[in-house]
Amino acid sequence: MWKNIVIVLLYIFFRLYHLQNSFFFFNDWGRDMLVLLKWQQGGLPPLLGPLTSALPFNQSAVYFYLLYPGFLLFHGHPVSSVFTCLLFYLLGFYFIKKVFKLNSPLLIIIFLFSIHPQLIIQNRFVWNPSFLPPLLLISIFSFYFLVKNYSSTHLFIFSSSITLAISLSYSAAPLLISFFIYWLLFSRKFIKRYLLSLFSGFLLFNLPTLVFEIRHSFFLTKQLLYQSPANQFNNNLISRLSSIISNLFSTNNPGINWFIFILFIVIAFYFIWHQRFNRGLPFYFSFLFLTTLIISLLLPITFHYQYIFPLLCLLVLVISSFPRFPKIILILFLSFIYLRPSVFQSYFKTPQRTYAQMDQCTKSFCQSFKEPIFVSTQASFHTFHNGPEHRYLLRKNGCQVKDIETDNGQADFMLVVEDGSRLTPDINFYELDLFGKYQEYKYYPCTPQFNLRLIEKVNDPPTSN
């Protein structure tokens, strides 16, 4: 019992320690908070989730429905997403323990989840892929027992977890393909029940999207069919594999990453060959890992860190199925790599501007300026200029924030948030182009790294006939 408590407390520690002053409120997080704020102020839930980077299509709005109770409970503070995500994981772990009775593997899973850099980072900076791992684990375990001994309960758990995971992030789709290949090779039973259950899950979790499509003459579907997706394909197989390995093991040492990867491939093939007749959990985990890896390599998109979760979950499961001695050695080695002081301290460092500083600065501005404004940002650490995190805070603090793309002409002022940088006459970007000619109206200093510059539109004088 004490082992369970210690490991769960370790997991919680890495998610919450020094969170108030170290969480980095930025871009996608601000986008999500802005959607939730509009829901709160307008009373209507969103029908679409976040837009995907690989396809011109949106994820399910279920993501926002998961975040909304915490958003209300924390009075709009973005840290609510971290607590929602933490609770989601803990409930997922509890569900696995109670339903599948896998206490020993679960402790290893929670421990490795606790210390893996990508999981810590993406649990302290929450967006839609952050919720995948518990759902993926549940789907993996339930599918194993489903194939071994079919039951309607396991089918319901499997279809619900995998369809919700894919609805939250399409990066979970390769795992579903791997499930199908495994079923095709080793089961081939109850196909109609599988398909009906999966279809029902996708329909349920994407019902808001379907409502949007019906209302807007299938706008997203037409966009998906006729608009070319962003060109993300990297046809260099070694480069794609290196990206996967780097994000999967996250040791910051390419040589160590490749060594562990090759070791895993050898062990996975060993499990598959050694258990080819009884097909126990080691065989099952290894088969899914290799199959999902191959599918990920063949997909026509660049492999980004947010796509790592299906492979990462399977990697941890393969480790949990190792024989006792090599399992202990590998866990100790990964612990040494992941818990080095330089890595450990990086999770808790204070950003160049804290949320409290941003909130105080925007609140002061909104108290003094009551005209409608557009918002953009000039930053030193990214190239985005739409600034959803700043639009959220300004709107939350009472400013009349307009959208430069949809409401152009409804404001004569633009607030440029200088986030570690300065707006100089030689700088230009899309939002400034839309705004037009301008002159500086007022400067609002807040901190050495975070300031506000209000600019005013300059209209050309009318020409005489």
Identify what each model region corresponds to.
Residues 61-65, 73-91, 122-126, 256-260, ...:
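Loop-to-helix entry region of an early transmembrane alpha helix in multi-pass inner-membrane enzymes
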Residues 123, 282-325:
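Hydrophobic/aromatic-rich transmembrane helices and adjacent perimembrane loops
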Residues 109-110, 154-170, 180, 201-204, ...:
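Membrane-interface alpha helices of multi-pass inner-membrane proteins
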Residues 1, 139-157, 165, 184, ...:
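Membrane-interface transmembrane helices that cradle and orient dolichyl/undecaprenyl
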Residues 14-18, 30-58, 62-65, 69:
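Extracytosolic helix-loop segments that constitute the early lumenal/periplasmic catalytic or substrate-binding loops
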Residues 333-448:
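Catalytic lumenal/periplasmic loop and adjoining terminal transmembrane helix
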Residues 21, 33-42, 66, 173-274:
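Transmembrane-lumen/periplasm boundary regions of multi-pass, lipid-linked membrane glycan transferases
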Residues 9, 83-103, 138, 142, ...:
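Transmembrane-helix motifs of polytopic, lipid-linked glycan transferases
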